[in-house]
Amino acid sequence: MANPILKLGLPKGSLEDPTIDLFDRAGWKVRKHPRNYFPDINDPEITARLCRVQEIPLYIQDGVLDLGLTGKDWVKETKADVVVVSDLIYSKVSNKPARWVLAVADDSPYQKPEDLAGKRIATELMGVCTEYFKERNIPVNINYSWGATEAKVVEGLADAIVEVTETETSIRAHDLRVIDEVLVTNTVLIANAAAMQDPEKRRKIEQIDLLLQGALRAESLVCLKMNAPAAKLDAVLALLPSLNSPTVAPLQNGEWLSLETVVSTGIVRDLIPQLREAGAEGILEYALNKVI
């Protein structure tokens, strides 16, 4: 009996290329077509389609898709009844969560949310924004923004905006100032509840989740391999962190040992000179595709 086909929703737009790259590192080659939104994927158990992140949660809820990647913000905004399989911390700019912030003109008198009572707010995240001001008992006029939200204040179309940002670069470029954080968000892998009850679909969902998580984890790690004299082993080992402990194996020359370990990319540039000074030789550094 043929395995069920999993219907996968991939985000279109700013997350599109980072997501396709992540799937590539996880083992799935996704090839886009210039004239449609149905990319090929090198797995007969999966059919993929590109969708707007705003639409994916409801497509998952309604069973149009079995599995998809979207923002935690859009799951909250749509109130979609979906299973959050895992958090996947990656984005178009960094591997950090993004923030929806309340921002005003840099030269405006507004210093806190309460100062905006009776004012006009522009945002794409209408539901979350409405809840934010309602919880604080601040009466405001919230208008939907169809894009270029940062420009609304500059153009005099709004007194403040609620917009998503990773680095605040665009916020500052429009002479805006953040006065509060509305929501922290990141990419999530979400599934249809019925699909999670189907054994074959669940198996495939868990496989995808495992390998995507492994690919993300590998981004911040590298493998180091080196040789060291047995007499200097302790000095070299003292410098080596690892997920568990370094692998040590004897070489044919009994006076030398081979060592292998996984370390954070952030310490490599300092670690390699220290290892060399401690007596290690033939030091190799190589990237990892997945760490499970």
What are these regions (language model features)?
Residues 47-66:
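Short, structured active-site "lid" loops
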Residues 2-45, 50, 70-86, 90-99, ...:
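Small-molecule-sensing regulatory modules
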Residues 58, 101-103:
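Signature of uroporphyrinogen-III synthase
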